[in-house]
């Protein structure tokens, strides 16, 4: 339903924010002077092998930017499909890597 889809998108938005900020804190804790913005953190996280799919994370950032500024039914359907097909996997991979490399 539309309500479930909208809830999925909202959870995606705040999960994306939490994820890139966790990557930012991990990078900073290890002496990296990266700017506190997703556009800077994503490539640096990729360079440091914190994430493996830079394109997927870039897609997430673009979707997050689009969903926060406007509502569009076609975009909502596209984002919901992306979350199901890709975003969950990307978030889980980051979580595993953070746990492994922070132990």
Language-model regions, residue ranges each:
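Solvent-exposed interaction patches of small proteins and small membrane subunits
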Residues: 1-103
């Amino acid at each position: 339903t539309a309500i479930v889809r909208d809830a999925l998108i909202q959870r995606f938005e705040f999960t994306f924010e939490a994820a890139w900020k966790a990557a930012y804190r991990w990078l900073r804790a290890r002496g990296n002077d990266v700017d506190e913005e997703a556009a800077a953190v994503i490539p640096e996280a990729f360079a440091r092998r914190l994430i493996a799919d830079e394109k997927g994370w870039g897609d997430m950032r673009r979707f997050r930017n689009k969903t926060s500024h406007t509502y569009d039914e076609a975009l909502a359907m596209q984002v919901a499909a992306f979350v199901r097909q890709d975003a969950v996997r990307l978030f889980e991979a980051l979580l595993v890597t953070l746990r492994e490399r922070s132990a």
